[in-house]
């Protein structure tokens, strides 16, 4: 059973998270365990202090090293991995998700707040992770991302085929999916999906997954060893007039968006 321990100043943020959807199911069936620890329980003095002004001056309060280390050491075991959630960390990607899910280590997730952590915390953790190049109020949402993504890959949580088809699992985005009605607003479900021909459907999905990846995340294909069939599909995709028009339109939109932002930032 995979165990997650979250160190946070705001335990109440996890109430809904733990009682909803896949996480609720995994907890109920004892496929995972989640323990929420309030860092203030390890605070200093009668005022439960966990932060202070930074040396050298500057805006914002800094989380103190003493309560953080005390909280971490109280939860660490020989089999645990301690993860600091910070925008300065390594980008969290699907390969890391798979690694965390595959090994037997329990995960301790340390959530920051305020201006950040006393830098000396780095001596007491194993990983620094970031879920993206943007700033959140604290690490709580990031810790939920880690728990959710790893839980999905834990044994018996969801159907194996479901997560194998997920975007990024094979360095491909997922193929388009449709449900009822067959027609809406003049837009139709592709005929091949209604044909009942399983081989043609599988080929269509492979083709469309490659197409979507090439348009939206082309760098993913650099990591992937393509089959002969996929190589043929990709060449066909690159030569599609309608597809190339869409790509030019997307690039034109992004160029205009960046141009406007640059103009706004320099005016």
Swiss-Prot record:
This is tRNA (guanine-N(1)-)-methyltransferase. One of its GO terms (biological process) is tRNA N1-guanine methylation. InterPro entries: Alpha/beta_knot_MTases (IPR029028), tRNA_m1G_MeTrfase_C_sf (IPR023148), tRNA_m1G_MeTrfase_TrmD (IPR002649), tRNA_m1G_MTases_N (IPR029026), tRNA_MeTrfase_TRMD/TRM10 (IPR016009). Belongs to the RNA methyltransferase TrmD family. It comes from Spiroplasma kunkelii. Residues 245-267 are annotated as: Disordered. One of its GO terms (molecular function) is tRNA (guanine(37)-N1)-methyltransferase activity. It is an enzyme of class 2 (transferase). GO terms for cellular component: cytosol. S-adenosyl-L-methionine binds at residues 112, 131-136.
């Amino acid at each position: 059973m995979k165990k997650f321990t979250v160190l946070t100043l705001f335990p109440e943020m996890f109430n809904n998270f733990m009682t909803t959807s896949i996480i609720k199911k995994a907890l109920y069936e004892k496929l995972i365990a989640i323990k929420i620890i309030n860092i203030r329980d390890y605070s200093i003095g009668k005022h439960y202090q966990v932060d202070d002004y930074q040396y050298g001056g500057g805006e914002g309060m800094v989380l103190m090293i003493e309560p953080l280390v005390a909280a971490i050491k109280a939860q660490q075991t020989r089999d645990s991995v301690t993860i600091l959630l910070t925008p300065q960390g390594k980008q969290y990607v699907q390969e890391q998700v798979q690694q965390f899910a595959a090994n037997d280590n329990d995960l301790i997730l340390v959530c920051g707040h305020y201006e950040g952590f006393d830098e000396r915390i780095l001596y007491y953790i194993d990983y620094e992770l970031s879920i993206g190049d943007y700033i959140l109020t604290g690490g709580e949402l990031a810790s939920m991302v880690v728990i959710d993504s790893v839980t999905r890959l834990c044994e018996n949580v969801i159907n194996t085929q479901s997560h194998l088809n997920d975007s990024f699992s094979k360095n491909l985005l997922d193929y388009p999916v449709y449900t009822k009605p067959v027609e809406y607003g003049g837009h139709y479900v592709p005929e091949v999906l209604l044909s009942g021909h399983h081989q043609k459907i599988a080929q269509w999905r492979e083709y469309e997954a490659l197409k979507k990846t090439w348009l939206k995340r082309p760098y993913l294909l650099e990591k992937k060893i393509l089959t002969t069939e996929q190589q043929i599909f990709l060449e066909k995709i690159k030569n599609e007039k309608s597809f190339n028009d869409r790509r030019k339109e997307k690039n034109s939109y992004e160029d205009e968006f960046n141009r406007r932002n640059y103009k706004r930032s320099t005016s």
